[in-house]
Design a protein with these regions (language model features):
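Hydrophobic, aliphatic-enriched repeat segments that assemble into extended interaction scaffolds
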Residues: 102-133, 139, 243-259, 263, ...
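Solvent-exposed loop segments that connect transmembrane elements
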Residues: 73-75, 128-223, 266-285, 337-339, ...
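N-terminal periplasmic/intermembrane-space "pro-region" immediately following the signal or transit peptide
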Residues: 20-230, 242, 620
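Outer-membrane beta-barrel pore domains
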Residues: 225-228, 409-620
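Outer membrane beta-barrel
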Residues: 109, 227-374, 390, 394-409, ...
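Bacterial N-terminal signal peptides
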Residues: 8-16
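Bacterial N-terminal signal peptides that target proteins for export
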Residues: 1-8
C-alpha cells in the first residue's frame, strides 16, 4: 500500500512538473483549475497517509486474532482501498486533461488556412490552316529508309528527282506507306537504330537544293485545313491547404498542399497536344488540372534576423507561383516572391535575403530545374554523354513596397537548359520518326540534350489611386543557344537549323476599379499583355486553362468582375481572349512561325481562342 502511495505521489509530482512546463499559450483558466485540483489531490494523499498509519496501528493490536482466524477486511482497510481507487481515478483524469492541454498547445503553434475554388469554363478555339510537321518528318524518314544502302538497314532504292513531277505528293505518300507496309520488319529495324544525329547526317549528305525541293514536294501531302476546337463546358475543383508554424521568434516553417482537377478526370497525365501545359512536369503539377492527389506545392523554412540583422535564409520548395502582378485578377494578396510575369513555376531552391528596411528587400535565389543524376539512367550513359543539371540563379529586389506602391526588379538566368523537363505524358507520335504510336501509353519524358542558357529581366510597378489599382510590367527574354538541336528543335530554332541568339519582350498592363459604394467588395478589372516573336518565360504553372496567358506571342485581353458575397466567399466572372501572332508560345525550343499563312507545325496551335469562366472561391 505504501508503494502505491509512493507511485501516486510520483505521478502527482510529474503532473505538477508538466503543468509548470506547460506552454505559455495554454489558457490561464485551464492552468488555474489544474493547480486547484493538484492541491486537492495533495490533501487527499495526506488524509490517506493518516488513515494508513491508523490502520497499521490497528493491525498490530489484532495480530493474534488474525493468526487464529481467517483475515477479514477491516473498515479502515476498506475505506483506504476506496480512497486509493478514487485517487487513482482522479490522477488518471488529470493525466488525460493535461495530455489534451498539451495537444491543444502544440496545435496552437500551427496555423491552418486555405481555400476551395469551383470554376466552370466555356472555351472557343480556332486552329488555322497548317502543314502537319510530324507527318512531314515521317515521310522524310520513310524516303531515307527507301534510299538508304542495305548496309545501313535501308532498301537501297535510288532516288529519282523526276518522281516529283510524275506523281502528286499524295500519290507519292501512298507509295511510301505501301512500301513500308510490305517491308515493315526491315523498317522497324531501321527506325529502332535511328538516332537524331543519324537523321541529320543523312539529310546533310543530300544536296541542299534537293532537300529543299523534296521538303516542298512532301509538304503538299500534309496540308490540314483549319477547324474549330470548342469545349462547351469544363468544370474544375481546386483545394489548397496552407500550414504555418512559428518555431521561434526567428524561425518558421510554411507549406501549402494543393489539389487541382477537372471533373471526371483524375489520371494526372494528359495527351500531349503541343501546348506547354499538356506535359506534367515538376514545375506545373498544381498549376494545371492534374488529379485528386494532394501535392506539395511549397514547403520551406525561413531563418530570419540572423545575427540580429536583416539577413535571412530560406530553403525548400519555393513560393515561386502567383507572384505580382498576377494576384490582382484573383482579388488576393501577393502569392509568390518573383515576378509572375517572368516566373510562375514550381521549383526547389534556396533564397538568401536582406531586409534593408520595412519597404526595401533584396534576395538572391538559386534553384534546380532538371536533376541529371537521379532517375534518368545516368549509369547507363558514358560520362561524356550525360546531361548537365539545369540550374537557376536570380535576384529579386523589392525596391519599394508600401500599402499603395510597389516597385520590383527580377533578374534570372537558367544555365544548361534542356529540351524540356522530366515529366509524364501520353505521346501520339514518335517525335523522331513521326510514326503514329498505335497504342498510346503513359510515358516518362526525359530530356536528351543541353541547349544553352536563357536570360530573363522584368520590372513591375503598381500603385493605388484611391479606388483604382493599376500596374505595368516590362519584361525581356534572351535565348543563348550552344548550337545543339534535337527532334523538337534548339533554342528558338527548328531541328535542322543552326541556332542563333534571339531576344524577346513582353509588356503587361492592368487596371482594377474597387467599387466604393460597397467598400470595394465589388471589383472591375481589365488586363492586356503583348509578347513578341521570340518571347519566352517560365510560366508553366500559371492557372489559365487554355494556356498561360503571359506566354503568348501575340495579344491577350482579359476583363473580369469579382464580388465578395462574404468576406471569405468570392464570386468571379472572367473573359479571356487570345490572339496569337506566332506559333510556339510557351516553348523555348523550335522556331516561331507566323500564323498569317499556313505554317509547318509539329502540333496544331490556336491562332485565336477565348474563354468565359464563372468561379466561386471560399477561403478559410
Amino acid at each position: 500500500m505504501k508503494r502505491t502511495i509512493t507511485v501516486l505521489l510520483s505521478l502527482l509530482v510529474c503532473s505538477a512538473a508538466m503543468l509548470l512546463a506547460q506552454d505559455s499559450s495554454s489558457k490561464p483558466s485551464d492552468a488555474a483549475e489544474m493547480r486547484q485540483e493538484i492541491d486537492q489531490l495533495k490533501k487527499m494523499v495526506a488524509d490517506l497517509q493518516a488513515r494508513l498509519d491508523a490502520q497499521d496501528k490497528a493491525k498490530a493490536q489484532q495480530q493474534e486474532q488474525q493468526a487464529q482466524q481467517p483475515a477479514q477486511p477491516t473498515t479502515a482497510a476498506a475505506q483506504a482501498a476506496a480512497a486509493q481507487a478514487d485517487l487513482t481515478t482522479s490522477v488518471q483524469d488529470l493525466e488525460r486533461r493535461m495530455l489534451k492541454s498539451e495537444r491543444d498547445a502544440a496545435l496552437s503553434k500551427v496555423r491552418f488556412s486555405g481555400d476551395y475554388r469551383f470554376e466552370a469554363h466555356s472555351i472557343w478555339g480556332n486552329v488555322p490552316n497548317f502543314y502537319d510537321g510530324m507527318q512531314l518528318q515521317n515521310l522524310m524518314v520513310k524516303t531515307l529508309f527507301a534510299t538508304a544502302p542495305t548496309s545501313q538497314g535501308g532498301l537501297g532504292m535510288p532516288f529519282d528527282p523526276n518522281i516529283m513531277s510524275q506523281y502528286t505528293p499524295q500519290q507519292y505518300a501512298g507509295m511510301l506507306n505501301q512500301l513500308v507496309n510490305h517491308n515493315y520488319g526491315t523498317y522497324q529495324a531501321y527506325t529502332n537504330q535511328l538516332t537524331f544525329n543519324n537523321l541529320k547526317q543523312a539529310v546533310g549528305s543530300m544536296p541542299p537544293q534537293q532537300v529543299s525541293a523534296l521538303m516542298n514536294y512532301l509538304q503538299g501531302a500534309t496540308y490540314v485545313p483549319g477547324y474549330k476546337d470548342d469545349t462547351n463546358i469544363l468544370y474544375t475543383n481546386r483545394f489548397r491547404l496552407k500550414l504555418d508554424s512559428k518555431l521561434a521568434d526567428n524561425l518558421s516553417v510554411t507549406a501549402r498542399l494543393s489539389m487541382y482537377k477537372a471533373w471526371g478526370d483524375s489520371t494526372g497525365v494528359q495527351v500531349f497536344d503541343g501546348q506547354p501545359n499538356s506535359l506534367s512536369i515538376d514545375g506545373n503539377t498544381v498549376g494545371t488540372p492534374n488529379s485528386d492527389i494532394l501535392r506539395v506545392e511549397r514547403a520551406f523554412f525561413t531563418w530570419s534576423k540572423i545575427g540580429n540583422t536583416g539577413l535571412y535564409l530560406s530553403i525548400g520548395r519555393r513560393p515561386s507561383t502567383s507572384g505580382p502582378p498576377m494576384n490582382y485578377r484573383e482579388d488576393e494578396p501577393r502569392g509568390g516572391t518573383p515576378s509572375g510575369a517572368l516566373i510562375d513555376f514550381q521549383f526547389d531552391g534556396i533564397t538568401a535575403g536582406y531586409r534593408i528596411n520595412d519597404r526595401t528587400e533584396l534576395r538572391a535565389c538559386y534553384g534546380v530545374g532538371y536533376q541529371s543524376g537521379f532517375g534518368n539512367g545516368d549509369i547507363l550513359e558514358l560520362p561524356q554523354d550525360r546531361l548537365k543539371n539545369t540550374h537557376f540563379l536570380g535576384g529579386n529586389f523589392d525596391i519599394y513596397n508600401s500599402e499603395k506602391t510597389f516597385l520590383q526588379l527580377t533578374i534570372a538566368r537558367a544555365f544548361d537548359v534542356t529540351d524540356g523537363f522530366n515529366g509524364l505524358t501520353v505521346m501520339t507520335n514518335n517525335p523522331l520518326t513521326g510514326d503514329v504510336i498505335g497504342a498510346p501509353v503513359v510515358m516518362r519524358y526525359t530530356p536528351s540534350a543541353n541547349l544553352g542558357a536563357i536570360n530573363l529581366i522584368g520590372v513591375n510597378f503598381s500603385h493605388s489611386f484611391g479606388p483604382v489599382d493599376a500596374f505595368i510590367s516590362g519584361n525581356y527574354s534572351g535565348l543563348r543557344p550552344n548550337g545543339i538541336t534535337t527532334p523538337f528543335g534548339g533554342l528558338g530554332s527548328d531541328p535542322f537549323e543552326t541556332p542563333t541568339n534571339h531576344d524577346g519582350g513582353m509588356v503587361y498592363v492592368g487596371v482594377r476599379y474597387n467599387l466604393p459604394q460597397n467598400d470595394g467588395r465589388t471589383k472591375f478589372g481589365f488586363e492586356f499583355n503583348h509578347g513578341s516573336k521570340y518571347w519566352f518565360n517560365f510560366a508553366q504553372a500559371q492557372d489559365d486553362i487554355i494556356a498561360p496567358k503571359t506566354n503568348t506571342r501575340g495579344n491577350v485581353y482579359e476583363t473580369y468582375i469579382t464580388h465578395r458575397i462574404k468576406s471569405r466567399f468570392i464570386l468571379k466572372l472572367d473573359y479571356l481572349k487570345y490572339l496569337y501572332n506566332y506559333s510556339g508560345s510557351g516553348w523555348h525550343i523550335g522556331a516561331p512561325k507566323s500564323l498569317d499563312a499556313a505554317p509547318i507545325l509539329g502540333f496544331p496551335t490556336y491562332d485565336r481562342a477565348s474563354m468565359l469562366s464563372l468561379g466561386m472561391t471560399t477561403r478559410f
